[in-house]
């Protein structure tokens, strides 16, 4: 319903589209919260009142007494690039108060590459079934330029707002072809480098926020043509990267990337490329992966934040590392987990899609000897996985006697090397029939709290929309608020609630250049109403949900519908939790459009009024 004004005698009555009554209001800037009533009209916060507002004629009133009213959360690290074409509502994020998502991370976007190349780039890396990624792109890819891509995304019945980065692998593939882009002997010509720079500039001109890259060669291609090759961006030289970063510098845009974990100098090169001192006093903001308290590197957390701050100060750099503010808990069906790509033997097994062929390989003695040698080799530098099979517990298995046991405990019982016990269990029960779990990082609450308050990090790395059977961090914002609230109650605060809200909203908007993240008068009305009494164990629970557009695949999700009372996008309440039990508005993601594509440099208020 559009707002309207009615004259009754000589008295004017202002009618709102939505009123959020008597909530504890956080504006997203870090200011202390106040109890206020918000009146929303034409997609904008029209009034922030200390007293009551006239509710006459208002079609939607949210009773927020005792609740927190916050700007909608921003998720800067998602892989919804294909899913947004199949479910523009992106329900798994929006139901947790997320109102803005960023696509095109980790060098992966679907802007320039054709549908088959894009599916090969995306599917194995992000563990989304290739057939559905390819189908989504073939059925919907009507664009050939960034401007057309943005128009196509913006034309969808979007639930949340969407912004995006251009992926370096996408860009490299479009210019070189996927074969040459993943060939270590190929170096782009001057003309090809110039074309990459031109195409990147066109994407930035169209409104994309920046570029994403990936230096770590752990991620592999899907498909049959170039299966198991590393991503194209990992083959780029620093000469190529510097040329593209210079385009970002000229435009004042951002780079998201990940250093090469096997080359410690790689991280330093990003600081130098970001530096104002070495680049004519014009730096480049960078968002890097990843700041975590990894079990494989227990001492790193004590120096990581300090080192980043020192380098930023000395070099005049603008580098922050993304941090997922929750325990990094992973699940795996057999070896279908990215950590196994660290091993050549793991990649060899993941190369095989046929279950029988994979089982035969896992049972082969020579293969096992090779795998053991790699597994036992001391790895210098960062590692994704702690490699401790005593810290890997079986949760599903045809042999019910093994459920609840770690692979290490089974190895002890059988007198085997832990890797052999692991492979034996997989072969005996059918590799993908054995589901197990481990926590690889962020397991120590005190260190996790320190990271959440560390100024050299920002909140991200949820990987929403990817690794469907491996992880579910869609509600990481709620989980951070729970920890901050619990610590405050215990008399050991590490982050005030208003600061936590800022870190999930306004701070991210400022760094990435997104027109979102605040909920002040005149701002676009993207909001979440949270019931703090339900920031409880439900936010940490394990759940699965069948995904119809992925052939009924059961993905890991989060379910805490009592926690989020309402989510609003662009002034429209699109989700009601609490007493409503988790309901989306009729037609949501189908014929009701609440979100839009947010171009770089556009302000939230201006967006609302022009929508």
Swiss-Prot record:
Pfam families: Amidohydro_3. Signal peptide: none annotated. GO terms for molecular function: hydrolase activity, acting on carbon-nitrogen (but not peptide) bonds, in cyclic amides. Keywords: Hydrolase. GO terms for cellular component: cytosol. Belongs to the metallo-dependent hydrolases superfamily. N-acyl-D-amino-acid deacylase family. PANTHER family: COLLAPSIN RESPONSE MEDIATOR PROTEIN, HYDRANTOINASE/DIHYDROPYRIMIDINASE FAMILY MEMBER. This is Uncharacterized protein Mb2937c. It comes from Mycobacterium bovis (strain ATCC BAA-935 / AF2122/97).
């Amino acid at each position: 319903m559009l707002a309207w004004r009615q004259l009754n005698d000589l008295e004017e009555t202002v009618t709102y589209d939505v009123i959020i009554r008597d909530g504890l209001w956080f504006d997203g800037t870090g200011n202390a919260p106040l109890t206020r009533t918000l009146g929303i009209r034409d997609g904008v916060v029209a009034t922030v009142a200390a007293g009551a507002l006239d509710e006459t004629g208002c079609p939607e009133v949210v009773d927020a007494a005792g609740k927190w009213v916050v700007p909608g959360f921003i998720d800067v690290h998602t892989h919804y690039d294909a899913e947004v074409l199949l479910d523009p509502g992106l329900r798994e994020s929006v139901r947790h108060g997320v109102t803005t998502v960023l696509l095109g991370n980790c060098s992966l976007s679907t802007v320039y590459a054709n549908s088959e190349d894009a599916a090969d780039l995306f599917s194995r890396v992000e563990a989304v079934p290739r057939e559905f990624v390819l189908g989504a792109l073939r059925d919907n890819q009507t664009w050939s330029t960034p401007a057309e891509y943005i128009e196509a995304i913006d034309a969808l019945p979007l639930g949340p707002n969407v912004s995006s980065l251009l992926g370096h692998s996408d860009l490299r593939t479009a210019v070189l072809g996927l074969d040459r882009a993943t060939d270590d002997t190929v170096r782009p010509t001057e003309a090809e480098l110039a074309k990459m720079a031109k195409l990147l500039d066109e994407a930035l001109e169209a409104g994309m926020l920046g570029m994403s890259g990936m230096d770590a060669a752990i991620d592999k291609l899907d498909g049959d043509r170039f299966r198991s090759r590393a991503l194209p961006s990992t083959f780029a030289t620093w000469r190529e990267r510097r040329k593209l970063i210079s385009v970002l510098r000229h435009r004042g845009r951002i780079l998201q990337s990940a250093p090469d974990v096997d080359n410690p100098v790689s991280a330093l090169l990003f600081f130098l490329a970001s530096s104002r001192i070495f680049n004519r006093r014009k730096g480049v903001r960078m968002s890097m992966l990843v700041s975590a308290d990894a079990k494989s590197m227990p001492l790193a957390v004590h120096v990581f934040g300090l080192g980043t701050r020192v380098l930023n100060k000395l070099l005049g750099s603008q580098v922050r590392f993304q941090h997922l503010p929750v325990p990094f808990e992973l699940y795996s069906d057999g070896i279908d987990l990215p950590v196994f790509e660290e091993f050549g033997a793991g990649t060899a097994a993941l190369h095989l899609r046929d279950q029988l062929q994979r089982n035969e390989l896992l049972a082969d003695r020579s293969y096992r000897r090779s795998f053991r040698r790699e597994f036992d080799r001391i790895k210098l530098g960062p590692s994704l996985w702690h490699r401790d099979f005593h810290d890997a517990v079986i949760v599903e298995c045809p042999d019910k006697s093994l459920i609840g046991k770690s692979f290490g405990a089974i190895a002890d019982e059988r007198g085997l090397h832990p890797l052999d016990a692991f492979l034996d269990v997989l072969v005996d029960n059918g590799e993908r029939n054995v589901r197990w779990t481990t926590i690889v990082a962020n397991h120590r609450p005190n260190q996790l709290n320190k990271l959440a308050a560390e100024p050299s990090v920002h909140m991200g790395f949820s990987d929403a929309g990817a690794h469907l059977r491996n992880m579910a961090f869609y509600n990481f914002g709620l989980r951070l608020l729970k920890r901050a609230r619990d610590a405050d109650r215990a008399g050991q605060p590490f982050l005030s609630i208003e600061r936590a809200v800022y870190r999930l909203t306004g701070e991210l908007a400022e760094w990435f250049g997104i027109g979102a993240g605040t909920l002040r008068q005149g701002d676009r009305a993207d909001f979440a109403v949270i019931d703090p009494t339900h920031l409880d164990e439900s936010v940490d629970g394990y759940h699965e949900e069948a995904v119809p557009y992925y052939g009924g695949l059961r993905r890991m999700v989060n379910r805490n519908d009592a926690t989020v009372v309402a989510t609003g996008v662009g002034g429209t309440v699109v989700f009601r939790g609490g007493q409503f039990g988790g309901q989306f508005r009729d037609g949501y993601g189908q014929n009701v459009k609440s979100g839009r594509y947010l171009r770089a440099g556009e302000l939230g208020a201006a967006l609302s009024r022009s929508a």
